[in-house]
Amino acid sequence: MKNYNQVYVENSLEAAQHYCRAFGAEITRAFLNADGTAYEHCELSVNGEGFLALAEAKNPCDVALVHRMKWETMTFNVFEMGSEEAVRHAFGVLSEGGMVLQPPGPLPWNPFNATVIDKYGVCWWIAK
């Protein structure tokens, strides 16, 4: 059995590239809508392993409201990233246009981590 998450976002073509840049991922499967302007389904992999799926949201959320309210209804946890530099890199990309909830640093349960709601309204906890 395998499990990974899927996000529904506005601007799915841009979001896929954004997440590839943040995590060193690559698009391994992609199905565009009829006019080629959005993903009906897209899968990202890191080192050959499925990491994240995404698709264009049919009813996108108000990301500005998510940022203003600092909503954390669900968090995607990416951990064992291998180094503080990997966490800093992902944090730098994910925080572009996003809302930082916790900057990179230690917590009692992890020596180096951060939490950010990205510009698509997705909350990420990233850790070494």
Residue spans for each PLM region:
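Active-site His/Glu-centered metal-binding helix of metallohydrolases
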Residues: 120
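Vicinal oxygen chelate
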Residues: 1-10, 17-117, 126-128
